[in-house]
A protein has these predicted regions:
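Generic short amphipathic/hydrophobic targeting helices enriched at N-termini
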Residues: 10-11, 361
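Bacterial N-terminal signal peptides that target proteins for export
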Residues: 1-10
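Residue-level hotspots at or immediately adjacent to binding/recognition sites across diverse folds
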Residues: 24-338
Length: 447
């Protein structure tokens, strides 16, 4: 609860009006913490369009286990698959899961776990990273090359040099990064591989290197590219066009950004520096790059600081990573709200609430507002207007003077007949632009 002045009982009439919002207010998000597997760490890696999430987390003894999270079933430990540690790296819209486990000799064993089926080993693969709906998957092959394949099919290397495939769509278009010589030269650059164009180097922003981390159905690739100043900037690359610099959150000094994922609408999420620390961002064409931290509930922020956003789906839900007070990474699902949340005003009161004539003096009146907000610790409440029951015949604009956000001077003068009533109209606005109107009254006694 936020109280601009201390308040006791509800001593004045409170009128709550409908909520309003600034037309350009960014969307707010509901936050669902994914929890843990009994350990301290849970890192999400991928999400499908149904909102199902996979990744890895520690159990009580510190061992890393693959997990699946669904809204219906919550967090599920997928086990070790016969190894000593396991990780899940991809999930498609059918619910098939891509991952790998380590045996006692720390040899990697990639697998696909079909929805409702049993694990299938993936031969010729060193580390799988992403899975498309029609079973295309990518990663690094056993000979250290980016590849694409379908389960049971041929593992097709798509670079002649050391490389990694990080993302793939249902058409088999693949994104990742590759070095340009064998043995590897100093810096890799991002690529897109398609059947029509083959291997396309996406370039940089004038620096030596770039990486690709996401691709959508249209073949739009996102990632990070080095500038000539050696600073990473998030980019979006539409097929046939140059890299689009998505910018940074903070101007002045060194500020970096990295794009991790893109949905089919072209919305991008990732990591950026804001105010000297890392945070999660979302980029859209209409709003540009925005910090997600102020858009989640205050209660969710109390769990820890947002660190990164790693996935966004067709419903614009976002998987975010945060760092808890102990420095451990945890994961949460951010679901966009259809409305703009507004403050909740429980009481408005004026002090004094009765003015005693007859000397007509101007009396200072102070307003107290009891207000709470899910997204803002301190919504701003102000007196926006005062109405006077005396009307223009008896009243005067010299009878009212707003002196501060929640203070006003009112003239203690009444006209014949009923008590004179001043109505103080209040607006409380949160950081998202959500607004609530309320009012309280001050009476000039006729006795």
């Amino acid at each position: 609860m936020t109280t601009p002045r201390n308040s006791t009982a509800a001593v004045a009439f409170v009128m709550l009006a409908s909520r309003a919002a600034f037309a350009q207010a960014p969307p707010a998000y509901r936050a669902d913490d994914l929890g843990t597997l009994g350990g301290t760490y849970l890192l999400a890696a991928a999400m499908n369009n149904n909102g199902d999430i996979v990744g890895s987390g520690t159990v009580a003894d510190g061992t890393l286990h693959a997990f699946r999270w669904t809204r219906a079933g919550g967090l599920e430990d997928l086990g070790l698959f016969g190894g000593i540690e396991s990780q899940a790296s991809g999930i498609n819209d059918r619910g098939d899961i891509l991952g790998f486990y380590f045996d006692a000799a720390f040899v990697t064993h990639p697998f696909i776990l079909p929805a409702g089926g049993t694990m299938q080993a993936l031969d010729g693969v060193f580390q799988p990273s992403a899975l498309a709906t029609n079973d295309w998957f990518t990663g690094m092959s056993s000979n250290g090359r980016a590849f694409r394949a379908i389960p049971g099919g041929v593992v097709e290397d798509i670079s002649a040099f050391i490389s990694f495939g990080s993302a793939i769509n249902a058409s088999g278009a693949t994104a990742g990064w590759s070095w340009h010589a064998d043995p590897a030269d100093e810096q890799p650059t991002a690529f897109r591989y398609t059947d029509g164009a083959g291997f396309v180097d996406l370039g940089t922003f004038g620096g030596p290197s770039s990486y690709a981390y996401g691709i959508n159905a249209a073949g739009t690739v996102v990632g990070a590219a080095d500038t000539s100043l050696g600073v990473w900037h998030a980019y979006r690359a539409v097929p046939g066009a140059a890299l689009q610099d998505l910018g940074v959150l903070r101007t002045g000094g060194v500020s970096r950004s990295v794009a991790n994922a893109v949905n089919d609408a072209g919305d991008v999420v990732g990591t950026a520096e804001g105010g000297g620390s890392l945070t999660a961002f979302r980029y859209t064409d209409d709003r540009g790059l925005i910090d997600l931290a102020p858009l989640v509930p205050v209660a969710a922020r109390a769990h820890g600081a947002l660190y990164s956003a790693v996935a966004i789906n067709a419903q614009k839900a976002i998987v975010a990573i945060y760092s808890d007070p102990n420095g451990e990474f945890r994961s949460e699902l951010l679901t966009p709200r259809d409305d703009v949340p507004a403050p909740v005003v429980s009481n408005v009161s004026a002090d004094p609430r009765v003015l005693m004539p007859p000397n007509g003096r101007m009396v200072p009146v102070y307003v107290t507002v009891d207000v709470a907000d899910e997204y803002d610790d301190s919504p701003a409440c102000t007196i926006v207007s005062v109405t006077d029951s005396a009307g223009p015949r008896f009243g005067s604009n010299q009878d009212v003077a707003i002196t501060g956000p929640l203070s006003v001077n009112l003239r203690a003068k009444w006209h014949e007949g009923d008590n004179r009533i001043y109505r103080l109209n209040i607006s409380c606005v949160n950081a998202l632009g959500g607004a609530t109107a309320a009012s309280t009254v001050v009476r000039v006694s006729n006795r």
